[in-house]
Amino acid sequence: MFSFFTANQANDALPDVIKKFEYALAKKNEITKIEKQLQVCVSTTNSFKEYMILKQQLNSAITKFYQSIEILESTGVMIKSIEQGLLDFPSKRFDEKVCLCWKHGETEIKFWHEKDSGFMGRKPIEVNDESLI
């Protein structure tokens, strides 16, 4: 179910969101690893059996990755980039839709940006910024 986050709600949800993000990132990295193994297999061996095993592993890893994305998105966050570690929490500032933003490695939500400005438009959340719902 969709809802807007206050800064406090986003920070309260963050530990669980980080855990789910890191799981999705691990699944993404697993896909990359298997893809590299598959490329090596294709270029260095003629083993159809090895190719099929790797292909099945890749298919399974892709399925798990998409499941992890669904689980992460079920928290209400918007995934901007798994690779760059960027997530947005939908929020409102006065009556304008904005995003509270998080980058992998940050321990709390400290920034927001207009809906269309993205990461480069990040602005710090003021300590008593009551304009954010």
What are these regions (language model features)?
Residues 21, 28, 62-65, 69:
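A structural signal for well-ordered alpha-helices, especially hydrophobic packing surfaces
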Residues 24, 28, 45, 76-79:
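Short secondary-structure junctions and interdomain/linker hinges
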Residues 1-8, 62, 126-133:
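Short, charge-rich amphipathic segments
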Residues 1-41:
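Long, hydrophobic N-terminal alpha-helical segment
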